[in-house]
Design a protein with these regions (language model features):
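Conserved ABC ATPase "signature" region
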Residues: 122-140
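Conserved ABC ATPase signature
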Residues: 144-148, 152
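Short coil-to-helix segment of the ABC ATPase nucleotide-binding domain corresponding to the Q-loop/switch region
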Residues: 102-111
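ABC ATPase NBD coupling module
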Residues: 76-91, 115, 121, 244
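Conserved catalytic motifs of ABC-family nucleotide-binding domains
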Residues: 165
Length: 261
């Protein structure tokens, strides 16, 4: 847990976010962002705007090209093996799940526990079973990812990200390709996490999601930002999003989606 509630969970100053395609280039320039613990941010943008790259940087999986990024007040430029515990306070759900096909669903979920030496094998098994049940994944525990549908793979990836009970949860386009039923499940579940309800009750979880479509995420308690023209543009609340005079925002709002949070 963060010792000082006044310290932002995420703080970026003058950050340039890089991406590796054929060569390294900058996709976001001069980014300033401060996110308090317990906030829920939705970062929208068109394809190749840098959404996934920003989440990779936020998770500590790659460094900024320029600028400073502090995670719970600690400068990530100074992170080494000793700071692994700080990175474990962040859970990451990749778009598509990014599970290991040679492992079962239960084994995939258990993977992060290898970094936690406090867990006995019996305790680890209990944690995995609890998450399997919570995600309705118990019947698929011994199945490999390639043999289940995409929506269940994505749930398993979420369970893996939650196994260490992170303080920050990052999700890359979690509603992509899902119909209303599965999307509604995600919206309800993330809303519970952000409010500190359910199995992870007690403290609201800090959540960042990326999105191609803003409509499903409308909620008065969430904050929104846009990636456009290599810039990170805070939009504010949902009311401010709806009244924003920005052509990209209008495009992301163009097609209403009948989903309920």
């Amino acid at each position: 847990m963060s010792e000082n509630q006044n310290i932002p969970a995420i703080e970026m100053r003058g950050v340039n976010v890089g991406a590796m395609r054929d060569a390294l280039f900058t996709v976001i320039e001069g980014m300033d962002w401060s996110m308090a613990s317990g906030e829920f941010w939705v970062i929208a943008g068109q394809e190749h705007s840098g959404k996934s790259d920003l989440l990779m940087l936020t998770a500590g999986l790659m460094p900024p090209v320029a600028g400073s990024y502090k995670l719970f007040g600690n400068d990530t430029r100074n992170f080494g093996e000793a700071e692994l515990a700080e990175r474990l306070r962040v859970g990451f759900v990749f778009q598509g799940g990014n599970l290991f096909n040679q492992l079962t669903i239960a084994e995939n979920i258990a993977l992060p526990l290898q970094y936690q030496k406090d867990f006995t094998p019996a305790e680890a098994q209990r944690e995995v079973r609890a998450l399997l049940e919570l995600m309705d994944l118990s019947p698929l525990a011994d199945v490999t990812p390639s043999n289940i549908a995409a929506n269940w793979r994505q749930r398993a990836a979420l369970a893996r990200a939650l196994i260490l009970q992170p303080e920050i949860l990052l999700l890359d386009n979690p509603l992509s390709g899902f119909g209303a039923r599965h999307s509604n499940w995600w919206l309800r579940f993330l809303d519970q996490l952000s409010r500190g309800q359910g199995q992870f009750g007690g403290k609201p979880m800090t959540i960042v999601v990326t999105a191609d479509d803003l409509r499903p995420w409308q909620n008065a308690h969430r904050k929104f930002a846009l990636l456009r023209d290599n810039k990170f543009i805070p939009l504010g609340t949902w009311n401010e999003v709806e009244t924003a005079n920005d052509p990209v925002v209008k495009e992301l709002l163009a097609e209403p989606v009948e989903l309920t949070p």
